[in-house]
Regions:
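A short, structured active-site edge motif that brings together acidic residues
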Residues: 55, 74-90, 134-140
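Glycine-rich phosphate/pyrophosphate-binding loop and the adjoining helix
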Residues: 169-183
Length: 183
């Protein structure tokens, strides 16, 4: 069995003027969310043995905060440009390229691709509350952990996963609940 942890980048600063969307940094609220989610992962003692991530600034800054908080700072992320603004289908290809040796993979990137990836991997069910929450919104710094009954990431396909966990920054600190979280 494999586990896939999906981490959306932290809240970014729309007020910062940058030439390219790729260069947009996270803001203070985003930094707090990334730290809280990292601490939560550490408390849960959920292992991660490989990280693949978008090289966009808001993802690298998220991981700069999340990894030490989660006690994962010894893992060097593999930066993959295909993850930047990728579709769910592209994200599945990226994950399949991981091979068999990583048992607990973490992918960090962007919406709508990550949200669509979760909804593609976890089958629809009337009684799956976590899937319903993701259908509503995968907010910034949210983390979903999926369990998948495969031995090799190359075998990953749709409707194969089940939720092990889903956590948002506002679940850990209600002051981080947004009126409208558009990024």
């Amino acid at each position: 069995m494999k586990t896939l942890t999906i981490l959306r980048h932290a809240k970014s600063g729309w007020d910062v003027q940058v030439e390219r969307d790729f260069d947009r940094p996270i803001n203070k609220r985003g930094a707090r969310g990334a730290d809280l989610i990292g601490q939560w992962l550490k408390r849960q003692k959920l292992p991660v043995d490989r990280i693949i991530a978008s090289p966009a600034v808001r993802v690298t800054e998220t991981l700069d905060i999340f990894q030490p908080a989660a006690d994962l700072d010894t893992i060097e992320p593999h930066w993959d440009r295909r993850i930047y603004l990728a579709s769910a289908a592209t994200l599945i290809d990226v994950i399949r390229d991981t091979g068999r040796d990583a048992g607990h993979l973490l992918i960090s990137g962007h919406n709508p691709g990550l949200e669509d990836l979760i909804l593609m991997l976890v089958p629809e069910s009337d009684d799956d509350e976590l899937r319903g929450e993701v259908e509503e919104k995968l907010p910034t710094s949210a983390l979903a952990r999926l369990e998948i009954d495969i031995d090799d990431w190359h075998d990953l396909d749709v409707n194969m996963a089940r939720f092990a966990a889903f956590i948002r920054p506002r679940d850990l600190d209600p002051t981080l609940a947004p009126a409208m979280d558009h990024d």
